[in-house]
UniProtKB/Swiss-Prot annotation:
Annotated EC: 3.1.1.-
GO BP term (any one): lipid catabolic process
Annotated transit peptide: 1-36
Entries under SUPFAM superfamilies matching the protein: alpha/beta-Hydrolases (SSF53474)
Molecular functions per Gene Ontology: galactolipase activity; phospholipase A1 activity; triacylglycerol lipase activity
Gene induction: Not induced by wounding.
Active site: S327, D384, H451
Tissue: Ubiquitous. Highest expression in flowers and seedlings.
Organism domain of life: Eukaryota
Phenotype upon gene inactivation: No visible phenotype under standard growth phenotype.
Recorded family membership: Belongs to the AB hydrolase superfamily. Lipase family.
Organism annotation: Arabidopsis thaliana (Mouse-ear cress)
Protein name as it appears in the record: Phospholipase A1-Ibeta2, chloroplastic
Length: 517
């Protein structure tokens, strides 16, 4: 009858004949041995157990002192083989999380995410007829929480169209026309878009700061219209897509328009100015969208004209119109979608995908968009204050609750919404992300970071569901986030980005936990 050692079931012999390494033991001969089957199992268990007892203290020290370069230099070889051969989670359950975070796989993944040359994207799926659901056919019911993987990819793609608009403007603020480097080579730009402010500044301001003249220009480039012209991509998406991308606030006059928060009535064929239930929108946003001058038509006229041309050009094809924007661009996107649905003959399905957008109009404006079949999906960061203005309600959830309670006859909130010039309402469906869910960003990130478009795309790429942690296999590179929001990235990763190559070679399989700082 065999006598088994305690915990012998943990260790399994890999072969029946083997030669020990240079570390000798009185229990283990240094020459190959042939033993009888009856004694073979016990001897192999003893060998494995003796190896573990001899090296266990070293392995514990290695785990507890993962940042000690001197210790790793002397013990790296033996420790690496031990970590690879033992089930540490079973021997020391409390070390499971630490071992997972220290794995070479995680370190290599972080190296890839921080690399300047690495820009990995999630693989695209064939959408086919599913594109209508992703475009809001059912108001994204069942697709937001948890977030559908195809919708996640689409949102990141739309955000990158807006980033291209930002880059095209800031690379040459005074240039016209300008080149737009699209993130998707299957699309081509068909029209540049310009917005004109109705605010006038004194001419002497240009003389004081001639190098910043672009900041005070009456008319500025705000985005573009692009259309997919790649047959293969059209087949993948299930239709030919027209994209309208609009950047956020950049010039002094655009900022001044942002601070005109009173509601104004939208143009109608036979307006009734005394009707308190008329659709109304923010004065400044409406001004930028509808104002033109002798040098350039209004953004509204330019956009409606181009979309009408494209719809006629591709008549008979399956089409869709996607309007996307960030910040000010998100606000103008709603006005543009409403205008297209109203004025473009035979308009295809229109959907808005916005990031960090403010409130734009009253409840009647939201109802008007819904009645026209315009679908709106707003991506909102819980810490972004821009999404909570303008308006008299600081908490949008309480706003909706108060509104429902105020629909009774003589309800106070109903009266406030109809008669107060600051009674704003959000539009459409909402995907809410949270800065605190990111393992890379500081939970107390500043206001600018909470509103930053790259931070939004980072959060969307890592979002699984409201009750789930950040996606472990997120593909989006952290390089741009580091470049633009370094002060808001956890110190661990700003340091790692500077010392990445050296750290990778020196530290081998060691990586601290993402949540440790």
């Amino acid at each position: 009858m065999q006598t088994l050692t305690p915990n012998a079931d943990i260790f399994h012999a890999k072969r029946r004949r083997f030669t020990c390494n240079t570390h000798t033991s009185t229990l283990i001969p240094t020459k190959p041995l042939s033993v009888s089957p009856a004694r073979k199992t016990n001897k192999e268990h003893l060998r494995n157990l003796e190896n573990v007892l001899r090296t266990s203290s070293n392995s514990i020290d290695h785990i507890e002192n993962v940042t000690s370069r001197q210790e790793k230099t002397t013990k790296n070889t033996s420790t690496s083989s031990l970590l690879g051969g033992l089930n540490l989670a079973r021997i020391w359950p409390q070390m499971k999380a630490a071992v997972d975070e220290m794995s070479p796989k995680n370190l290599k993944r972080l190296q890839r995410l921080l690399s300047k040359s690495s820009e990995e994207r999630s693989p695209k799926s064939k959408l086919g007829s599913k594109w209508r659901e992703l475009h809001g056919l059912n108001n994204w019911a069942g697709l937001l929480d948890p977030l559908d993987e195809n919708l996640r990819r689409e949102l990141v793609r739309y955000g990158e169209f807006v980033q291209a608009a930002y880059h095209a403007f800031h690379s040459d603020p005074e240039g016209s026309p300008r080149h737009v480097a699209l993130p998707d080579g299957s699309f081509k730009v068909t029209k540049s878009l310009y917005a004109t402010s109705s605010v006038r500044l004194p001419k002497w301001i240009d003389d004081v700061a001639p190098d910043l003249r672009w900041m005070t220009k009456q008319t500025s480039w705000v985005g573009y219209v692009a259309v997919c012209d790649d047959p293969r991509e059209i087949r993948r998406m299930g239709r030919r897509e027209i994209v309208i991308a609009l950047r956020g606030t950049a010039t002094l006059l655009e900022w001044s328009e942002n601070f005109r928060p009173n509601l104004v009535s939208m143009p109608e064929p036979k307006p009734d100015q005394s009707d308190p239930t008329r659709p109304k929108v923010e004065c400044g946003f409406n001004s930028l969208y509808t104002t033109g001058d002798q040098h350039a038509p209004s953004l509204a006229e330019s956009l409606v004209g181009e979309i009408s041309r494209l719809v006629e050009l591709y008549a008979g094809e399956e089409l869709s119109i996607s309007v996307t924007g960030h910040s000010l661009g998100a606000a103008i996107a709603l006005l543009a979608a409403d205008d297209i649905a109203e004025r473009v003959p035979h308009a295809p399905p229109v959907a808005v995908f916005s990031f960090g957008g403010p409130r734009v109009g009253n409840r009647e404006f939201a109802d008007r968009l819904d009645s026209k079949g315009v679908k709106v999906l707003r991506v909102v960061n819980s810490q972004d204050v821009v999404t909570k203005v303008p308006g008299i309600f600081a908490d949008n959830d309480k706003q909706g609750q108060s509104r429902n309670n105020g629909r009774s006859p003589g309800g106070i909130m109903e009266m406030v919404e109809r008669n107060n010039p600051w009674a704003y309402s959000h539009v459409g469906a909402e995907l809410r992300v949270d800065m605190k869910m990111s393992p890379y960003l500081k939970p107390n990130a500043d206001v600018a970071c909470c509103h930053d478009l790259e931070a939004y795309l980072h959060l969307v790429d890592g979002f699984l569901a409201s009750n789930c942690p950040f996606r472990a296999n997120a593909k989006r590179s952290l390089r741009k986030l580091l470049d633009e929001q370094r002060s808001n990235v956890k110190v661990l990763y700003t340091g790692k980005s500077l010392r990445l190559n050296r750290t990778f070679h020196d530290n081998g399989d060691v990586l601290p936990s993402p949540s440790s700082s």
